[in-house]
């Protein structure tokens, strides 16, 4: 190493040492920085302690507050009860007092098993009752099954006193319709005098039932029926969310060939609907959610009357179900869940295509095969006219 190089290294080293000494913080600055760091850690610890305390208090309020009117319903063991007729098997859980699955006996899935619309993990139904001093959220409370028969069950949410709320279900014979009444008994002092509604939060993942994802996606939609208008639906091809001022007669979580429909005798108000697309391969088409209110009488003199249709989008079946809907002030028009096209085409579809569909599906064929055969038959019928046009 020559002399110039050595001198260069020495100078560089001297500059670095001098720069580090010059920029070194003073003792006072280091103490101030340490105090700042300590204060940051103290604040973080205090905040964490507050959050832990709040969580503990929340849990304690849920599980240990013996002053709650529903203290005894906070804990329990989940049990299931099944109602069935010749068409559908509906399973209920005492947790939340709700329907947790529906299986259609006359339809099979891709594995050849009875087709299930949804199960407990794929659906939720929560009722929120606003009280004077506490609110009731039914989804996490345990009900007591009462009056169980082959076609009826009453889920009772018992207070620590004599009052209770009943969810009374009745599966109608030879039908996909479940009548659902809600009634409060002996709870006038729990609710505010002005309380006239109950909040409902309903959600469901729409299963992929057919092999063709894109085609099924296109005909899977969250459909709704305003009380004074025809039915409509959210977008089938993108995420969509809408809020409505007008009352709704029913809301349907519709798949291509099957639907879960919630119908209100006293209509739904303050409705917000949301539909989210699901990815191919997930096993689901869409994630549905509906938030709304409906009539509720805290005195128990009048029941909240709901109905659930859990079945196929079969035109004649839906048409017959219209007559079983309690609210007949307006035509329920459940058959609109089957899209028949524009007015002229609609008549052809109603009187020819639907009968052809019923005949083919009566052979127990997969829906995809039924549609393929229908396409071939229709093309054969229109072939002579099509050939002449060329």
Where are these regions (language model features)?
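Interfacial loop/helix-cap signal at membrane boundaries in integral membrane proteins
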Residues: 311-367
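Intrinsically disordered, low-complexity linker and terminal tail regions
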Residues: 45-64
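Subset of Sec-pathway N-terminal targeting signals
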Residues: 1-50
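Selective transmembrane helix interface/packing segments
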Residues: 2-3, 113, 150-153, 165-170, ...
């Amino acid at each position: 190493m020559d002399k110039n190089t050595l001198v260069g290294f020495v100078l560089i080293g001297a500059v670095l040492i001098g720069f580090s000494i010059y920029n070194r913080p003073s003792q006072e600055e280091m103490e101030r920085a340490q105090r700042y760091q300590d204060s940051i850690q103290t604040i973080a610890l205090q905040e964490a302690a507050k959050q832990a305390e709040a969580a503990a208090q929340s849990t304690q309020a849920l599980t240990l507050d013996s002053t709650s009117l529903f203290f005894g319903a906070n804990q329990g063991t989940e049990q299931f009860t099944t109602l069935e007729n010749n068409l559908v098997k509906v399973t209920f859980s005492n947790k939340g007092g709700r329907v947790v699955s529906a299986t259609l006996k006359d339809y099979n899935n891709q594995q050849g098993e009875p087709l299930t619309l949804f199960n407990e993990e794929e659906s939720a139904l929560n009722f929120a009752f606003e009280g004077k001093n506490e609110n009731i959220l039914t989804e996490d409370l345990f009900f007591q099954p009462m009056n169980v028969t082959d076609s009826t069950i009453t889920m009772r949410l018992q207070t620590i006193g004599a009052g209770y709320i009943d969810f009374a279900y009745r599966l109608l014979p030879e039908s996909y319709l479940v009548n659902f009444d809600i009634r409060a008994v002996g709870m006038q002092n729990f609710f505010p005098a002005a309380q006239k509604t109950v909040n409902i939060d309903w959600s469901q993942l729409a299963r992929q039932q057919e092999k063709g994802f894109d085609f099924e996606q296109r005909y899977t939609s969250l459909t709704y029926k305003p009380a004074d208008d025809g039915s409509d639906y959210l977008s089938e091809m993108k995420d969509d969310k809408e809020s409505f001022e007008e009352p709704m007669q029913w809301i349907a979580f519709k798949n291509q060939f099957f639907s879960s429909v919630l119908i209100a005798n006293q209509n739904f108000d303050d409705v917000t609907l949301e539909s989210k697309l699901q990815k191919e391969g997930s096993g689901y088409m869409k994630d549905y959610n509906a938030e709304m209110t409906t009539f509720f009488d805290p005195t128990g003199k009048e029941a909240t009357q709901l109905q659930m249709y859990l079945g196929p989008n079969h035109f004649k079946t839906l048409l017959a179900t219209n007559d079983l809907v309690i609210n007949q002030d307006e035509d329920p028009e459940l058959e609109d869940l089957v899209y028949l096209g524009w007015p002229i085409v609609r008549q052809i579809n109603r009187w020819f295509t639907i009968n052809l569909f019923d005949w083919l599906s009566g052979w127990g064929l997969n829906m995809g095969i039924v549609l393929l055969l229908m396409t071939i038959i229709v093309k054969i019928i229109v072939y002579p006219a099509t050939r002449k046009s060329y």
